[in-house]
């Protein structure tokens, strides 16, 4: 039973860690910006993946390691962490993106803010949407990865208006493309994580209690408490009472059969005793006369 519980705990931990956000994170060094540390807040970012699928000589599709979006990041001046959540193309279908490096370019103009380039190293379909968390970012503007000229930097082609994440508001608003179903999927992910934690806690408690009982009462042979002894005595008393009752139910038949057989034995034995007396008397008389 303990082996089954251990394997179930391993399976539950694997299922919960499969969608863990910490496994799909990457970091980038953020350069000093125009904003102070007081305006830091967690942001949601949704970008479109404009990658084109190429084919090699064998005809197998692959995606080149090229930028998919350019971020104009104005943050706290510290390290920025990008947590990948999912990539969605159709409702109720999501694609987990685990490899998304972020590269920082130092602008030629010292007054300009640094840019973060998102690069995809996995294969994704065109038109999919990427949802990411950007902690420590005050303001982000998304640019197209194909247009990297000065004019495109001044006038964004694709913009994303981000709002601070709070406990009550987890939605993301975008200006150039439809909003994916982020709230429903995020809630389902959190619900699965919560239930996985509950299941793991129950399995751990069961394993601890079972292991402690086996170690104490079986290995070290510690006697049971008084309550356990009382229960055992009650069980033994009930068992003895039932056994006696069965024996009493079987006794009347045996006694009657014994009583029926005894008179016959007496009847058979009585003639034998009289015959023996007669023979002795005759023998004595014979001896006296001669």
UniProtKB/Swiss-Prot annotation:
Membrane topology of this protein: Single-pass membrane protein
Cross-referenced Pfam families: DUF4711
Region span, Disordered: 153-178, 246-276
Protein's cellular compartments: Membrane
Endoplasmic reticulum as UniProt keyword: no
Residue stretches of biased makeup (Polar residues): 157-178, 252-261
Protein name: Uncharacterized protein C17orf78 homolog
UniProt organism field: Mus musculus
């Amino acid at each position: 039973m303990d082996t089954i519980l251990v394997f179930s705990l391993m399976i539950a931990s694997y299922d919960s860690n499969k969608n863990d956000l910490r496994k799909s994170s990457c970091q980038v060094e953020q350069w000093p910006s125009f904003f102070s540390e007081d305006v830091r807040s967690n942001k949601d970012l949704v970008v479109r993946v404009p990658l084109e699928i190429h084919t090699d000589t064998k005809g197998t599709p692959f995606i080149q390691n090229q930028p998919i979006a350019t971020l104009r990041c104005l943050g706290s001046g510290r390290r920025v962490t990008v947590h990948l959540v999912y990539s969605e193309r159709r409702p109720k279908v999501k694609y987990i993106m685990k490899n998304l490096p972020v590269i920082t370019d130092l602008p030629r103009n010292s007054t300009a803010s640094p840019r973060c380039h998102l690069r995809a190293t996995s294969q994704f379909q065109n038109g999919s949407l990427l949802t990411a968390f950007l902690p420590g970012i005050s303001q982000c503007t998304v640019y197209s990865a194909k247009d990297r000229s000065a004019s495109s930097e001044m006038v964004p082609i694709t913009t994303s208006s981000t709002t601070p994440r709070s406990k009550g508001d987890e939605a993301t608003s975008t200006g150039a493309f439809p909003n994916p179903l982020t709230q429903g999927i995020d809630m389902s992910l959190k619900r699965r994580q919560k239930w996985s934690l509950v299941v793991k806690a129950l399995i751990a408690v069961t394993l601890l209690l079972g292991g402690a009982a086996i170690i104490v009462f079986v290995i070290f042979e510690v006697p049971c408490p008084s309550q356990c002894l009382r229960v055992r005595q009650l069980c033994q008393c009930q068992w003895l009472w039932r056994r006696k009752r069965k024996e009493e139910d079987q006794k009347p038949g045996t006694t009657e059969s014994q009583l029926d057989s005894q008179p016959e034995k007496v009847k058979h034995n009585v003639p034998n005793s009289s015959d023996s007396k007669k023979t002795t008397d005759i023998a004595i008389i014979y001896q006296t006369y001669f």
